[in-house]
């Protein structure tokens, strides 16, 4: 099982120390209700080699072992990594193995990074972090500490496997909780919420939860689905959107800016918008499920299979 005690020790003398009032008990409760495959997934972490490696987190997430793996070792490592499928966010280049994930998350990072306040020496929260790809890119930008939260057990085990292959780097940590379970810490310099808002039944509550984690003046990085329209435009799918049953609100950019200002964010601005392409989200050998092409109208990729506008994403920055 994953041991969270090193993280508790790590934050005990930081601005996150107040979290220790609630977090250990929450994670003990979490361990009692984990997915049936969690023990199997967590055991795979133990199979990862302890070899030293050259690490690159600046322009990719890559580990190159000082002593190359043999053919047999590479085959065995690939087998273990494939047991943690599906790999959704990446890509990773680990010990000579290319994990070609469903999403080219580096595309999103390249769109977001130029607009951010410098991440060097910052304490960062990544909400809905998945397996942690963007967390490692934040570390590559010099972040002091990155904490990701995501309640999905598979993502936690994927993260811990990657961490081990990156030399057990402790600058990034994944905590398997949701934002709604966090006490207001007001301790993070930057908070990321990317690909989360449209899954929330109460988007304004989510924005308030994000704000409660930021230091005064701290930066919010919000990336979410948007729709064309004016300040009064917001799509509420009748049933599914792109085959997803948990999509509730897709606002226009102006509507989203209005929401952020309404809950007290300052200096709200849209810095990027992009239609999701079949190059950015696609099926690979590391994903057995359907992907974007299956979610779009086969005769008109400008629409989802349900007839809604195809996915378009915007990046909004704001300050607490």
From Swiss-Prot:
Keywords: Transferase, tRNA processing. It holds the Pfam family Methyltransf_9. GO terms for molecular function: methyltransferase activity; transferase activity, transferring alkyl or aryl (other than methyl) groups. It is an enzyme of class 2 (transferase). Its EC number is 2.5.1.-. Belongs to the class I-like SAM-binding methyltransferase superfamily. CmoB family. This is tRNA U34 carboxymethyltransferase.
């Amino acid at each position: 099982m994953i041991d969270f005690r090193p993280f508790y020790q790590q934050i005990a003398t930081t601005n996150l120390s107040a979290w220790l009032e609630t977090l250990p008990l929450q994670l003990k409760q979490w361990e009692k209700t984990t997915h049936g495959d969690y023990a199997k997934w967590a055991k795979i972490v133990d199979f990862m080699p302890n070899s030293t490696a050259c690490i690159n987190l600046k322009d990719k997430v890559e580990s190159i072992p000082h002593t190359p793996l043999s053919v047999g070792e590479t085959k065995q490592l690939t087998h273990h990594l494939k047991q943690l499928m599906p790999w959704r966010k990446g890509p990773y280049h680990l010990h000579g193995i290319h994990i070609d994930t469903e999403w080219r998350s580096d595309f999103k990072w390249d769109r977001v990074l130029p607009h951010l306040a410098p991440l060097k020496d910052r304490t960062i929260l990544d909400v809905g972090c998945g397996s942690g790809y963007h967390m490692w890119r934040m570390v590559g930008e010099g972040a002091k500490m990155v904490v990701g939260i995501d309640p999905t057990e598979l993502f936690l085990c994927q993260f811990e496997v990657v961490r081990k292959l990156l030399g057990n780097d402790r600058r990034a940590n994944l905590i398997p909780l949701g934002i709604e379970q966090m006490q207001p810490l007001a301790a993070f310099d930057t908070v990321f919420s990317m690909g989360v808002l449209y899954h929330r039944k109460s988007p304004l509550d989510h924005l308030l939860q994000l704000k409660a984690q930021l230091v005064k003046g701290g930066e919010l990085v919000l990336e979410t689905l948007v729709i064309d329209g004016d300040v009064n435009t917001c799509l509420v799918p009748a049933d599914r959107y792109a085959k997803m049953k948990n999509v509730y609100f897709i606002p226009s950019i102006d509507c989203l800016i209005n929401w952020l200002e309404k809950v007290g964010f300052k200096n709200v601005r849209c810095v990027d918008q992009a239609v999701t392409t079949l190059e950015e989200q696609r099926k690979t050998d590391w994903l057995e499920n359907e992907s974007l092409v299956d979610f779009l109208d086969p005769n008109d990729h400008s629409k989802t299979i349900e007839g809604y506008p195809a996915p378009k994403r915007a990046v909004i920055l704001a300050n607490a």
